[in-house]
Amino acid sequence: MSTRIALATYERAPGLAPDDRMLIPALERLGIRAQPAIWSDRSTRWRDFDAVIIRSCWDYHIRFGEFEAWLAALDADAIPLWNPAPLVRWNADKRYLLDLAGRGVATVPTMIAMRGHADAVESLATAEGWDRFVIKPAISASGYETFALRTPLDDASRATIARVASLGAVLVQPFADEIARFGELSFTFFDGAFSHATVKRARVGEFRVQTEHGGTVDSIVVERALIDQAAAVVRALDVRPLYARVDGITRGDAFLLMELELIEPNVFMSYAEDAADRFARAIAQRLG
């Protein structure tokens, strides 16, 4: 009997995002049957699968309570999940950046304002001397409720901060000019090994690089020193993830981490030859 795995997705992409569909034939070549399954579909019999791989679950941040319950249910049934639930829970709250900084990872400076403390956002930015800064919910994805603001704040900006702070804890970071000048680098790793790199660029008049906001993605060849710095981020974790996307900027010769994506990142397989096969081999190795 062949191995059967679920590639978890969400309701708006029941057949997976286009990039993730590349995994199905790559896994089939290794004798592994893979099919999309909507994570929130209560009719799905997850115990019928040998493992679940989180892929296009791009609504988890706005349904986080349900998502946590789904993770717990898979755990209770001892269904192998990658990335594993403890790592997913840790990565879901962007305060993980503070944890990684404490482990010696070079990150973009990050401050936290607690839920409902909108006034703390302005105080933090002012105290750090940031005349332009970015806010986002600690639990968010795809540029959700992410804004670039300037000091001194006007009434509209304060209203925006109040709305974001009402959702939960808020990340406050200095605006990275490097995003506008060059873009954001993304390094994809499968089972701890570097696969490929891409660069995401924002459209004119926008700072968010996600394609949902008009951003573009291109493949890029990066120097070994940058790959090594991105790899050090992955090595800083307590467990080696099946997949990881390390996002950040370069400042001089240094790579600064902006996000470590371990839940449902687009790993841009279509931008690198044989990337889908590398991912498939990593999955096969985990399955044993």
Regions found by a protein language model. Give the residues of each.
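ATP-binding N-terminal substructure of ATP-dependent carboxylate-amine bond-forming enzymes
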Residues: M1-W82, L87, R95, D119, ...
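Short secondary-structure junctions
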Residues: I32, V105-A106, G129, L237-L242
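Phosphate-binding site of ATP-dependent enzymes
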Residues: Y144-V234, D238, I249
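ATP-dependent carboxylate activation and anion-phosphoryl transfer catalytic cores
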Residues: R224-G288
